[in-house]
Amino acid sequence: MVQISDLPRDLTEEVLSRIPVTSMRAVRFTCKKWNTLSKDRSFTKKHLRGARAAAKKKQTKEFQVIMMIQFRVYLYSVNLLNPSIERIGKLISLDVEDHVDISKIFHCGGLLLCITKDISRLVVWNPYSGQTRWIKPRNSYHRLDRYALGYEEKNKSCRCYKILRFMDDYEDDRALRLIREFEIYDLNSDSWKVVNVTPDWDVEFYHRGLSLKGNTYWFAQEKLPPLPRGRVITISDMADFLLCFDFTRERFGPRLPLPFHSFVEDTVTLSSVRDKKLAVLFQPCSASTVKIWISRKIEPNAVSWRKVFLAVDMKSLTGFQFDINAASFFVDEKKKVAMVLDKDRFSYKFTRNIAYIIGKKGYFEKVDLGESTVSSCASLVCSYVPSSVQI
């Protein structure tokens, strides 16, 4: 009897190219021959072409997204109108024993930048190929670091991926010492370099940047001067804007206007629409209405906004404000529906991870994603398209 592992290469390729992305880990562990074939450039192109075609066929109803839940990273299939959220599988692990806890993820071009739970390690990961690159710090990493993953597109077939790491904070160590560090890691040269930046803006450490077309955008606010020791003031209102880091020019762009004005305790979070447009969610702490806008034009130096994409009064639906530190979301532009990930805020202990699906005319659904044993672990979501890029 002929074993499947003994099939001719062309027939083996045809069979394996039909296997879902989340099953590739099992393929690689089946035998050495399949492991070698799965990493072949011609095979990966064929496999990804088939995966994208299948995903496109399903996109009338479903999306594939990455979610980070309980310090683990999973691939989900999401139907916002049915509604249903199905865990397709855990993405290829960062290590065989799967003992790596992840606290933050950043997605760009099929790659994930992952920050470990203990803040001590940084890794770039291609979930499709299973490749990883552990990044050693120039000096050290810090709990208040902000990160971004982006790329410089040298031509249509060549992208130079880079990581931006920065912090600009005062440590409460009696000396009120300012730590200001801006540096870029180049994956091609495997090296860090310092970038000279004197910001007149602040990005809170819990605000994740959003990668779009190789650049990263943040919600930012006016920088406040340090206060004399012992003096405390309450500030609820300050200038707010969108800020972009251009990975080609390796510099921050000008302040870009938002379609609203927010206060300190309001919820503001960013998302992307098919890696072409930027979406922003805004919910004031003083009101119950959630509003979402989608950009008409978005570049490092310019942005224009469409009219409100979605406005939903949450008072009768949930009665609470989405978390300013943790809520993340994505939208189905055609169906005019959005999904917001947060905790079960009907419970005092926030013991469940919940997807809140909202739409026009009061459309509202809740999907329970399972137990949340660590209330401080935010559930993150981002759209995902597999990539064969080598790291």
UniProtKB/Swiss-Prot annotation:
InterPro entries in the record: F-box-assoc_dom_typ1, F-box-assoc_interact_dom, F-box-like_dom_sf, F-box_dom, SCF_F-box_component
One GO BP annotation of this record: protein ubiquitination
Kelch repeats: 104-154, 163-215
Pathway stated in the Swiss-Prot or TrEMBL entry: Protein modification; protein ubiquitination
SMART domains xref list: FBOX
Domain F-box: 1-47
Main location: nucleus
Superkingdom field: Eukaryota
Disulfide bond entries: none
Cellular-component GO terms for this entry: nucleus
Gene3D superfamilies to which the protein is assigned, alphabetical: 1.20.1280.50
Repeat as UniProt keyword: yes
UniProt-annotated location(s): Nucleus
Keyword Iron-sulfur recorded: no
Coiled coil regions, renumbered to chain: none
Keywords: Kelch repeat, Nucleus, Repeat, Ubl conjugation pathway
Domain notes: The F-box is necessary for the interaction with ASK proteins.
Assembly behavior: Part of a SCF (ASK-cullin-F-box) protein ligase complex. Interacts with ASK11.
UniProt cross-references to NCBIfam families, sorted A to Z: F_box_assoc_1
Function per UniProt: Component of SCF(ASK-cullin-F-box) E3 ubiquitin ligase complexes, which may mediate the ubiquitination and subsequent proteasomal degradation of target proteins.
Name of this protein: F-box/kelch-repeat protein At3g16740
Organism: Arabidopsis thaliana (Mouse-ear cress)
